[in-house]
Amino acid sequence: MADLPETPAFGAAFSDEEEAARALEAGRWLFSQTCSFVMGCVSLDTLPDHDLSEIAFAGRSNVGKSSLVNALTGRKTLARTSNTPGRTQELNYFRLGPEAQDPALMMVDLPGYGFAEAPKDAVKRWTRLIMAYLRGRPALRRVCLLIDSRHGIKENDRDVMRMLDEAAVSYQIVLTKADKLKAAEITDVLARVVAETAKHVAAHPDVIVTSSQSGAGIDLLRAQLAALASP
């Protein structure tokens, strides 16, 4: 894979090398801990009751949400992956961290929105569930909004971004599948995404470029998410 571009949006996550080293080590430590599947939820009234911070992974169908969860945790089969758009149809909860000990996180792998190889009524049902969860979950600390780096931000992504802005829910753009692009292409899509993201009030300023295949950007994302863990 081509080297990731050195841009302010990609490299300004930490104020100095010492802070970066501490944050990266905290991320490495947390994501090396036990991570286990908790439950799959098909409605808001079945969401688990807990006191941990939640991090949700959202994006279009087949954008690589489950692959990213697996890459973050270093477990190839934690979240079920598929080449079939729409395979994930529940809100899948995973608990990350030492048992009965802080820090810890609850990660939520959401169904994809947009095109899916599933009945239309099922797609509508889980799309409503996704939007209701994103708007009204008190435990939700951040949404990682995954964007396929080959395609950039699409209109249904913009719909989600506007909804999160209106609900004042913090979200961070994570570009996926960067291994599919050349360095110049990555630089171009990153610049366009950073410029558009800057117009959204709830968007985190750092856009992270990742590849679940090569591991690029995974350490940085681990570090930023570990900072949100319940103390």
Curated annotation (Swiss-Prot):
Residue sites binding GTP per the record: 59-66, 86-90, 109-112, 176-179, 210-212
Naturally occurring in which organism (per UniProt): Rhodospirillum rubrum (strain ATCC 11170 / ATH 1.1.1 / DSM 467 / LMG 4362 / NCIMB 8255 / S1)
Alphabetical keyword list: Cell cycle, Cell division, GTP-binding, Magnesium, Metal-binding, Nucleotide-binding, Septation
Gene Ontology molecular-function annotations: GTP binding; metal ion binding
SUPFAM superfamilies per the UniProt record, alphabetical: P-loop containing nucleoside triphosphate hydrolases
Keyword Cell division in annotation: yes
Keyword Cell cycle in record: yes
Cofactor entry: Mg(2+)
Domain EngB-type G residues, every copy: 51-231
Protein task: Necessary for normal cell division and for the maintenance of normal septation.
Record: residues binding Mg(2+): S66, T88
Name this protein carries in UniProt: Probable GTP-binding protein EngB
Pfam families, A to Z: MMR_HSR1
Homology family: Belongs to the TRAFAC class TrmE-Era-EngA-EngB-Septin-like GTPase superfamily. EngB GTPase family.
Coiled coil regions, renumbered to chain: none
Gene Ontology process terms (BP): division septum assembly
A single GO cellular-component term on record: cytosol
